[in-house]
Design a protein with these regions (language model features):
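Phosphate/dinucleotide-binding and metal-coordinating scaffold of catalytic cores
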Residues: 1-109
Length: 109
């Protein structure tokens, strides 16, 4: 199972996971209890229960580069363009906007 830490600005907001049945996103309890907590997307409102989807959530898929940037990522990191979680974890550490995703290494789990 591959996972990534999701940050808003530099604040840890939650975890996105790839599971055998699809994808899960869950806000961290610490983030949910912050006074100024905001959802990462209107499609992923603040809630304690995890979100589940068979495909990568549209919001996260939208963070992945397109066009020539996707071609460069595919060539440089040898990632198949259909491996959306692999692209998200590799390419979205420093995105345009205030949301970023950092991979969780095996040892961190």
């Amino acid at each position: 199972m591959r996972q990534g830490k999701v940050f808003i600005e530099s604040t840890f907001a939650g975890i996105i996971s790839e599971t055998p049945s699809g994808f899960t996103f869950k806000y961290s309890n610490d983030y949910l209890h912050q006074e100024n907590a905001m959802p990462i997307s209107l499609t992923l409102p603040l809630q304690e229960e995890p979100f589940h989807n068979k495909t990568l959530f549209s919001f996260f898929d939208g963070l992945i580069p397109e066009g020539w940037l996707l071609n460069i990522a595919e060539r440089n990191w040898k990632i198949n363009r259909r491996d959306r979680m692999g692209l998200l974890l590799t390419c979205c550490k420093d995105c345009i906007g205030n949301v970023s995703v950092e991979p969780i290494e095996q040892e961190e789990r």
